[in-house]
Amino acid sequence: MLTLSYQGVDGGFYQCATSLDASLHLEPVVSSVDPNGAFFAFEADLPSVVDPYTLFTEEEVSALVYDSATPLSLSDGDQLTSLLSALAFSDQNQAPVNDGYTYVDGEDTLRVLQGGSVVYHSSGEGRYTAQPGLSGAVEAAWVLANAAAAPLAGQARLYLLSAQADADQKDHYTVIFGYCLNGSAVHLYDDGWAAVFEVTEGVVTDFTIRLRSYSAAPQQALLLPAEKAAAALTALTQDSRELSVQYRDNGDGQAVPYWNAT
C-alpha cells in the first residue's frame, strides 16, 4: 500500500511504499462510506482561479439567518455602568453629546455612541498597557474587546481578523477583531470589523468597538450549490481562491449568509 502526502508550499504530491495491507487497513475504513457525489474543483469545468483541491457537492446549502441589534441602550444606566466597569473607566466626568455620552478621565476620553460604537482615545500615557511586540498588542486588545463586546454579543463570538506591525512607525501595531456566527465570519457594515485597536510603545492609544448582538432567527436561507457559486462569483481571484459562507450585517436587523471568496 502507498501512502500519499501533499505539500501545500510547492503544490506537489508525494508517495511512499509501505508494508501495510490495504485489505486490513484501508478497505475496512472506506467500506462503510457511500459516495455522495462530492468532487474536487479540478474534476469540473470551473474557473481556473478556484483552488483545485476545493471539495464540492451538488446539494443546496442552507444556513441560519440571525437577528442582529445594537445591544446597548443609552437610557439604561445599569448597562452603561457595566460597560464602563468592564473597561475600568470612571463615570465621574460625563458629558452628553448629540449622539451619546463622553467620559473624560485625566487625559483619556471614552465616547459611547447611540449606534453602539465605543470610541477611546488617550493623549497621555494611557491606562491600558501591553506587553512588548505584536503578541503583546494582540493580548491587550483582546482583553478589552472581550470584556466590552462578548457579554452583549449573544450567539456571536469574537475572533482575530488581523494584526499588523506598522512598517513606518516603530512599536506601533494595529489589531482588528471580527464577529463570527457558528464559525462563519460576519461582515459588519461597510468595512467588516467589530473592533480595531492601535497600540504604540506598549500602550493602547485608540480603539473603536462596535457592539452588536446576534440571535438565531426561526428561518434558514438557501444558498446556491458551491459549484454554481464558484462559477458565478467574480470575487474569486488568484489571491482569493477559496469559497466560504459568511454573514453580512448592514445594521438593518438581520445577518444573512452569502458565499464569499477568501
Language-model segments: which ranges?
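C-terminal, well-structured catalytic/ligand-binding subdomain of enzymes
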Residues: 192-228
